[in-house]
A protein has these predicted regions:
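Transmembrane alpha-helix termini and helix-breaking/packing motifs in multi-pass membrane transporters
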Residues: 133-144, 310-311
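Extended non-transmembrane interhelical loops and adjacent amphipathic helices
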Residues: 78, 82-109, 196-203
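Transmembrane helix-loop junction
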Residues: 66-67, 89, 107, 139, ...
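Transmembrane helix boundary and interhelical junction motifs in multipass membrane proteins
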Residues: 55-58, 91-102, 260-277
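Hydrophobic alpha-helical transmembrane segments in multi-pass integral membrane proteins
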Residues: 199-202, 265-269, 275-298
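Predominantly cytoplasmic-facing regulatory/coupling regions of multi-pass membrane proteins
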Residues: 1-82, 148-261, 300-328
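Mid-bilayer segments of alpha-helical transmembrane spans in multi-pass integral membrane proteins
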Residues: 85, 89-95, 123-135
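Membrane-interface alpha-helices at helix entry/exit sites of multi-pass transporters
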Residues: 75-76, 93, 98, 108-124, ...
C-alpha cells in the first residue's frame, strides 16, 4: 500500500473517530429531543455562507493574480482554492496547501516565481485580518482566559496589531535580512539560504501590493468578507436548534478560534478545532447539542471542500502528484 493510501486511510479513520467521540461525550437525552426540532433552513443558510465565502475568496485570488500581471478563469480559481483544502488536510502543519496552490497556478501559466508570493500574500492577508480584528473581539466579548485579565488581553491584542503593521515595513529592510540570517545561523546553519529565500519571496509579494495600493486594499477587504462569510456557517447551523443566536458574539469567537487554528500542529487542526469549538460555543446552544454542531461545522467548512479539492487535484495531476507531495 502506498504512503498516499495509508495517509488517506489514517485521515479518514482519525476524522471519523474524532467526530464520533465528540458526539458521544457531548450528547444527552435532552439533546435527542432537541434534534427533532432541526430545520432544513439552517442547513441552507450554511450552504449559502459557504458559497459566499468561496466567492469572495475567488475574487481576491483573481485580483491578486491580476496584480501580478496574469489572468485566471473561474475554473482555475476554483481549482486553486479547493486544492488548498485538500492538500492542507493531508500534510502536517497544512504545508501541502501552499504547494498545491502554486503548482495549480503553474498549470494555468502563472510561473512559480509569481505564484509563490501570490499564495503567500493570500495567507498573510487572512492572518492579518484576524489579528487586526482581535482588539474588537476582546472589547466586545468578555472571553475569560485563566490567569490573564481582560485588560491584559486587550493590551496583547493591540500590541499584536502594532507588531503586524510594523512588521510589514521592517520585512523590507536590511535589518530584517540580518536578523533572519543570524537566526538561521543560530538554529539551522545549513538552511540559511532557505530562510533568506522565504523572506525574499514574502518581500516580492509585498512589492506587488505596494505597486497597486488601491487594489491591494480591496484584496484585504475581500479577504475579510470571505472569512466572515465562512464563519457564518457556525451560527447558521446553530439556528437548527435555537433561535436565540448572538451572531456578533459567535463571529468574534470564530475569529479567535480560527486564528489559533492557523498554528495548530495537527493536519487540518483535527481534534483541536472541535475541542475549541465546544469550549467557546457550548453556552450558546441547548445542552448536549454543541458536539453535533461542532462536527457539522467541520463537515461543512472543511470536509466538503476537502473532497471537492481531492477531485480537482486528482483530475488535474493524478495520483502521482498527491503521492509525491504527501511523501515529502
Amino acid at each position: 500500500m502506498s504512503k498516499m493510501m495509508r495517509r488517506g486511510i489514517f485521515m479518514f479513520v482519525l476524522l471519523f473517530a474524532v467526530s464520533l467521540g465528540i458526539i458521544y461525550y457531548t450528547i444527552d437525552l435532552e439533546a435527542l429531543k432537541t434534534i427533532t426540532t432541526f430545520n432544513v433552513e439552517s442547513l441552507l443558510l450554511a450552504i449559502i455562507a459557504l458559497a459566499l465565502g468561496m466567492y469572495f475568496d475567488g475574487l481576491r485570488l483573481q485580483r491578486l493574480v491580476k496584480i501580478g500581471g496574469y489572468h485566471l478563469s473561474i475554473k482555475a480559481v476554483l481549482r486553486v482554492i479547493f486544492s488548498n483544502y485538500f492538500m492542507a488536510m493531508l500534510t502536517p502543519g497544512a504545508s501541502g496547501g501552499a504547494v498545491a496552490q502554486v503548482l495549480v497556478l503553474r498549470s494555468y501559466d502563472v510561473p512559480i516565481s509569481k505564484g509563490t508570493p501570490i499564495v503567500l500574500i493570500r495567507t498573510v492577508f487572512s492572518i492579518m485580518f484576524l489579528v487586526i480584528m482581535l482588539p474588537i473581539v476582546f472589547l466586545y466579548d468578555s472571553i475569560e482566559i485563566p490567569y490573564i485579565s481582560r485588560d491584559m488581553l486587550l493590551l496583547f491584542s493591540f500590541l499584536a496589531v502594532m507588531a503586524t503593521l510594523l512588521g510589514t515595513y521592517l520585512l523590507q529592510t536590511v535589518y530584517m535580512r540580518k536578523f533572519v540570517y543570524n537566526l538561521a545561523q543560530h538554529f539551522k546553519a545549513h538552511k540559511t539560504k532557505d530562510w533568506l529565500a522565504k523572506l525574499e519571496t514574502l518581500n516580492q509579494g509585498l512589492a506587488l501590493l505596494y505597486k497597486k495600493p488601491t487594489q491591494s486594499f480591496i484584496v484585504f477587504i475581500e479577504s475579510g468578507l470571505s472569512l466572515l462569510c465562512l464563519y457564518c456557517i457556525a451560527p447558521a447551523l446553530m439556528f437548527a436548534f435555537t433561535n436565540d443566536v448572538p451572531i456578533i458574539t459567535i463571529l468574534d469567537r470564530m475569529i479567535l478560534l480560527n486564528l489559533i487554528l492557523y498554528f495548530a500542529p495537527t493536519p487540518g487542526g483535527t481534534g483541536i478545532a472541535e475541542g475549541l469549538f465546544i469550549l467557546l460555543f457550548a453556552p450558546f446552544v441547548p445542552s448536549g447539542t454543541v458536539g453535533i454542531i461542532a462536527v457539522a461545522w467541520r463537515v461543512m467548512a472543511e470536509y466538503v471542500p476537502f473532497f471537492i479539492g481531492m477531485y480537482a487535484v486528482l483530475t488535474l495531476y493524478g495520483r502521482q502528484f498527491v503521492a509525491q507531495e504527501t511523501s515529502n
